[in-house]
């Protein structure tokens, strides 16, 4: 009779979350994850063919959670302002995890950048206020607001700033207006 599996995919993903949210991706090793579960690395490799697959499954789980739980909260009538407020709140409430995902350099950085870009466009394309803007203007708004949001979030995560929702709304609306009026001026060019 085969032995019953005691460590499941969910256990492993929970251990990955603990490691990344306390140590960052620098701690993302089979040994560290196994140590969190107080086991050998064998269960990890029984569930995942390699660490790249585990990382991809983890990032997919994280982005689904961000999409469905974090970024769906509404504070204003503006989808871009709400994305920013949610991003800054997430950084403030989960500082190490935020830095691990969005600041530190790691193999999933491009995937997370694409997630942020795609989510922004999904929101603005379904919003009457923004949907008819040109792609150039939407890209300018995304770039400028994203750079500003990352800066604000980094300050919030390090407890150097604690902007209110109203302050965030005011700053982002100013950035949106500047981007609409001057789409050729972005913070990354």
Where are these regions (language model features)?
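Amphipathic C-terminal alpha-helical segment
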Residues: 97-100, 146-164, 177-188
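Alpha-helical DNA-contacting segments of helix-turn-helix folds
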Residues: 53-62, 70, 101, 105, ...
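Amphipathic alpha-helical packing segments from all-alpha helical-bundle domains
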Residues: 105-144, 170-180
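HTH DNA-binding helix-turn interface
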Residues: 21-25, 38, 45-55
């Amino acid at each position: 009779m085969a032995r019953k599996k005691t460590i499941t995919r969910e256990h492993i993903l929970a251990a990955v979350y603990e490691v990344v949210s306390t140590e960052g991706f620098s701690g993302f090793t089979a040994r560290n994850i196994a140590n969190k579960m107080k086991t050998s690395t064998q269960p990890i490799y029984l569930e995942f063919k390699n660490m790249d697959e585990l990382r991809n499954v983890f990032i997919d789980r994280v982005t689904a959670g961000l999409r469905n739980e974090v970024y769906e909260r509404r504070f204003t009538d503006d989808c871009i302002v709400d994305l920013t407020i949610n991003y800054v709140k997430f950084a403030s409430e989960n500082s190490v995890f935020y830095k691990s995902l969005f600041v530190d350099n790691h193999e999933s950085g491009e995937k997370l950048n694409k997630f942020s870009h795609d989510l922004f466009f999904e929101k603005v394309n379904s919003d009457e206020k923004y949907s008819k803007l040109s792609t150039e203007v939407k890209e300018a708004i995304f770039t400028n607001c994203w750079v500003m949001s990352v800066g604000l979030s980094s300050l919030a995560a390090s407890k150097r700033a604690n902007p209110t929702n109203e302050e965030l709304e005011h700053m982002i609306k100013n950035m949106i207006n500047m981007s609409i009026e001057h789409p050729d001026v972005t913070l990354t060019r």
